[in-house]
Structure formats: structure tokens, C-alpha cells
Design a protein with these regions (language model features):
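Compositionally biased intrinsically disordered regions enriched in Thr/Gly
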Residues: 8-247
Length: 247
């Protein structure tokens, strides 16, 4: 027999149970579960956990700047939450439509992970997986600059006028070549027989985050720069590569 459980938006912090064990990694920002959608029958299964970024009350209101950063962080968190809810609402609607049409077997999972977070940056990763015959995974990254409260853009990390896109892209190409030379099972679309598929350059919209070593980590989804079997590749750009152009 089919069984479905839908937990509606939380009205109390105590209801935010699924991520309540995650420690607060910054004094300002934390994550709770906004909604938990679960469904399972003989042909369909879904486990969709919708995270929500929350901002702690500003306890350091001694300065006008602190209050302004707190308000900006709240605004940024609201924007991120709206984007996440739009994504997950769409995925739930697609799942339910496919289920209603009895289109075969399907599985959908959405979860989140707090990535390496420092005193200055907070990053939430939304992980989506969908399978119906074959499977696909794709991710979204949300980084808040805790010193400004704004969502961090790649350009924010570099000196004005610097060609950071080329510098990062060249290093990624070098890493791709080194990985393929060391492991025949590693395949990237680089100098291939189908040049139109080859990786040429990242853009300002390419996903990234900063790890605990303050290194830029560039993230691709399945099929972006390699066959789907390679998963979602990530490339850590060494600090020394960007030393001359980072702010």
C-alpha cells in the first residue's frame, strides 16, 4: 500500500528536527528543515528534505555596521530560501505528475549539506538526485559572506580587472590532463574528437565554494565537463595559483 508523509513548514524551532543536530558553524547563520516530503510505493519513492537558512538575532548591536550586516544577512537568507523552495516545489510537482501518470519506476532525493564554513563564509549545498531508468545528480551552492551579509559571487574574491576566469580555467585544464594521465578511467571533455563538447572556460555563473583552507573549489554537475559516469567533478584551485589576483 502506498504511504505518503508531508510535513508542512515549521512553526516552531523545536519542529526543525532533521537538522537540529547540526552544530552552529557561525554565530549568525544556521540551517533547519523547512519541509520533509516523503512518499513510497511499489514504483515510486521520494525523500525530499527542504532546508531553510535562518539568521540568529543580532546580539552585538553595539555598532551600526553590525546591525546593517545582520539585516542584509536576513535578506540574503530569504532570497536563498525562496530559490530553494522554488526548486524543491518544482521537483515535487514533477514527481507527483509522473506518479499520477504511472510512467514507470522513479526515485527522487533532495538533501543538503553544510560545507566547510569559516568565520567569514557560510556555504550550503543542495544535492538533488533523480532516477527513472538512469540516474542524474546535480547540485546548487549558496555562499554568504558573513562580513557583508551578501551572497558571495566569484568576482567578489578577485582584484578588479584581473582575468581570474582564464587563470582558474587554465588550472582546471591542467588538473584534468594530469588526472587522465594518471588514471585511464578518468575522462574529461578536453582536446577530444568532439570539440564542441570540450571544456573551454568557466563563467561567473559556474558553481564554487571556499574550503577550510580558503581555496576556491570549482564545482560542475554531471555531464558538464565529463561523461555522466564521472559524477559531479570538483577542482580545488591552489592558493598559490591565485595569489597575485585574490583580494
Amino acid at each position: 500500500a502506498a504511504a505518503a508523509l508531508v510535513i508542512l513548514p515549521n512553526t516552531s524551532a523545536s519542529v526543525a528536527y532533521a537538522m537540529s543536530q547540526v552544530p552552529v558553524l557561525s554565530r549568525l547563520v544556521e540551517v533547519v528543515t523547512f519541509r520533509d516530503y516523503h512518499y513510497e510505493d511499489d514504483r515510486n519513492s521520494a525523500d525530499i528534505q527542504v532546508p531553510e537558512v535562518t539568521v540568529a538575532p543580532d546580539t552585538d548591536a553595539d555598532t551600526q555596521k553590525s546591525s546593517a550586516v545582520s539585516e542584509q544577512t536576513k535578506k540574503t537568507a530569504e532570497e536563498i530560501n525562496t530559490e530553494i523552495q522554488t526548486i524543491t516545489d518544482r521537483l515535487i510537482a514533477e514527481f507527483e505528475e509522473s506518479k499520477a501518470n504511472e510512467e514507470g519506476y522513479q526515485n527522487m532525493t533532495v538533501k543538503s549539506e553544510i560545507l566547510a564554513t569559516t568565520d567569514q563564509y557560510f556555504t550550503l549545498k543542495l544535492i538533488c538526485f533523480q532516477s527513472a531508468g538512469s540516474g542524474a545528480e546535480w547540485n546548487y551552492y549558496y555562499t554568504i559572506d558573513l562580513s557583508t551579509g551578501k551572497r558571495l559571487q566569484l568576482a567578489d574574491l578577485f582584484q578588479e580587472g584581473s582575468d581570474y576566469l582564464t587563470t582558474i580555467s587554465d588550472n582546471i585544464k591542467q588538473q584534468m590532463k594530469e588526472q587522465m594521465a594518471a588514471d585511464e578511467n578518468k575522462i574529461y571533455w578536453l582536446d577530444s574528437d568532439t570539440p564542441e563538447w570540450d571544456f573551454t572556460s568557466i563563467t561567473d555563473n559556474t558553481s564554487f565554494y571556499l574550503n577550510q583552507n580558503n581555496e576556491v573549489v570549482v564545482c560542475f554537475n554531471e555531464g558538464d565537463v565529463a561523461p555522466m559516469s564521472m559524477g559531479c567533478p570538483e577542482f580545488v584551485i591552489p592558493n598559490e595559483v591565485l595569489a597575485g589576483i585574490r583580494k
